[in-house]
Amino acid sequence: MTRSALREDQDSTLSEVAGERTLRIGEDNPIRISSGHRILHHDGKCSRPHGHNYEITVEVTGTLTDDGWVVDKGDVTDIIDEWDHRFLVQAGDPLVEAFETSGDSDSLIVLDHPPTAEVMSVILEERMLESFPDTVSNVSVAVRETGELCATY
C-alpha cells in the first residue's frame, strides 16, 4: 500500500484500505510467565510437580479496528497472565483436592487435558479467539517450555 492510500481514501474504513495485517507479540522479547504443572500419567519425571519459566509468543491476523490495530496487546497479555504463578493440572488429578484442602485453590488451573506445552498453546489460542473482536481471522500461539521444547498451534 502506498503512503497516500490512507490519506486519499478518507471515506473508507481502515480495514477496507489496509486489508488483513498480522500483529506479532513477543517475537524478540517473549511474554514470560512462571507456572507449575505435572503430567499425571507420564512414566517419567514429568509426573512429579515442577515448574517452568514459559516464554510465549503470539501472532494475531485480522483487519484493523477503528482504533487502528489488529488487537489490543493488553488483551493478549491479560489472557496469558491468568496462568502466571499458577499451577496447571488435568481434571481428576489428586492435587486438585490437595490445593483445595490447603486453601490454595485460587492458584490452581484445572484443564480438561494434560497441561503440556502443546495443550497450553491450543487453549490459549482458543481463549484468544473467543475474546477477540470478529475482525480477527487467525491466532497462533507458541509456548516455549524449555530451550529445547516449543509448541505452536
Task: Show where each model-derived region lies.
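Charge-rich, low-complexity N-terminal segments
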Residues: T2-Y153
